[in-house]
């Protein structure tokens, strides 16, 4: 199985696209089976079926509601692997250990 990440920002164009690339690089280097997509906060509900983890800045993460086996990771600096990396890995290792190589 592959853990599916959705990067969310206010407009879905700038920050989430960069965050998508940073998360992809980080998870590839961490040997995690994954896919990463991005969208605007207003579109996240239509993208939930294809995501296991939603990653967003802390102020946007508070607006995101999920149910079931889906998780939201709020980060202060969504462009810094030093900030989002440990939080994201913690959720993956706890809830998606089969994706850690």
UniProtKB/Swiss-Prot annotation:
Active-site feature positions: 9 (phosphocysteine intermediate)
Induction info: Induced by L-ascorbate. Repressed by UlaR.
Sequence positions bearing Phosphocysteine: 9
GO BP annotation list: L-ascorbic acid transmembrane transport; phosphoenolpyruvate-dependent sugar phosphotransferase system
Result of knocking out the encoding gene: Cells lacking this gene are unable to use L-ascorbate.
Keyword Phosphoprotein: yes
Species, as recorded: Escherichia coli (strain K12)
Name of the molecule in the record: Ascorbate-specific PTS system EIIB component
Entry EC no(s): 2.7.1.194
Coiled-coil segments on the chain, per record: none
Catalytic activity: N(pros)-phospho-L-histidyl-[protein] + L-ascorbate(out) = L-ascorbate 6-phosphate(in) + L-histidyl-[protein]
InterPro entries registered for this protein in UniProt: PTS_EIIB-like_sf (IPR036095), PTS_EIIB_2 (IPR013011), PTS_EIIB_2/3 (IPR003501)
């Amino acid at each position: 199985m592959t853990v599916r990440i959705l990067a969310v920002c206010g407009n879905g164009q700038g920050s989430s696209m960069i965050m998508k690339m940073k998360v992809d690089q980080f998870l590839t280097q961490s040997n995690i089976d994954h896919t990463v997509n991005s969208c605007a906060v207003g579109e996240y509900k239509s993208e939930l079926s294809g995501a296991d983890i939603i990653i967003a800045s802390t102020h946007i993460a508070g607006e995101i509601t999920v149910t079931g086996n889906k998780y939201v990771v709020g980060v202060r600096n969504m462009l810094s692997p030093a900030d989002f990396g440990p939080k994201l890995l913690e959720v993956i290792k706890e809830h998606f250990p089969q994706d850690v190589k």
